[in-house]
């Protein structure tokens, strides 16, 4: 939280258990508290994700990043996945933006496009590449695919594996407008 304040980062991404403490540390700053819902595997039920969203917001979360249920998606339960996104969006909106985490490295191109379309249909604010928990990384190819799939109806957050200014700039140029990285200070300093 202190580094985010010092460097003016947009948000600090944390688990719901730490939202209240982070909100206290960031009170009076422009740095937002971003709660990871369904983290890390997205396998919680819709009911739990909605409850987690409401609880995080009540404790001071100003943004919500929800992990989709990748297993349900892989099983072809598209209606379930889209409904889950809609329910989390409904719990958060209109005051708290929602980012839908795809776990891009686990999905086919067709599945990535499908989830992006679900996020748009559910009126999510962003689609996001990865949690950083399961491996993988944000790639230029994924950002370009996601940008085409959302067609300007959602913003894009690149997250995971962004270690250098060069990688950051490549993803920015591809269409990402927000970034999740543990290397923010190095990137800001141009390293």
Question: Which residues are covered by each model-predicted region?
Answer:
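Small/polar loops that bind or transfer phosphate-bearing groups
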Residues: 14, 159
């Amino acid at each position: 939280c202190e580094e985010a304040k010092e460097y003016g980062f947009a948000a600090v991404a944390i688990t719901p258990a730490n939202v209240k403490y982070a909100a206290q540390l960031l009170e009076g700053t422009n740095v937002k508290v971003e709660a990871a819902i369904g983290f890390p595997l997205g396998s919680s039920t819709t009911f739990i994700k909605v409850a987690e969203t409401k609880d995080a917001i009540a404790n001071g979360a100003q943004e919500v990043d929800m992990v989709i249920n990748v297993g349900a998606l892989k099983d072809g339960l598209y209606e379930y996945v889209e409904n889950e996104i809609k329910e989390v969006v409904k719990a958060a909106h209109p005051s708290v933006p929602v980012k839908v985490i795809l776990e891009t490295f686990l999905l086919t191109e067709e599945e990535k496009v499908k989830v992006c379309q679900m996020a748009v249909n559910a009126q999510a604010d962003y689609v996001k590449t990865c949690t950083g928990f399961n491996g993988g990384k944000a790639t230029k190819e994924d950002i370009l695919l996601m940008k085409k799939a959302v067609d300007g109806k959602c913003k894009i957050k690149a997250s995971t594996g962004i270690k250098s200014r060069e990688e950051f700039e490549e993803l920015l140029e591809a269409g990402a407008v927000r970034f999740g990285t543990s290397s923010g200070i190095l990137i800001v300093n141009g390293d």
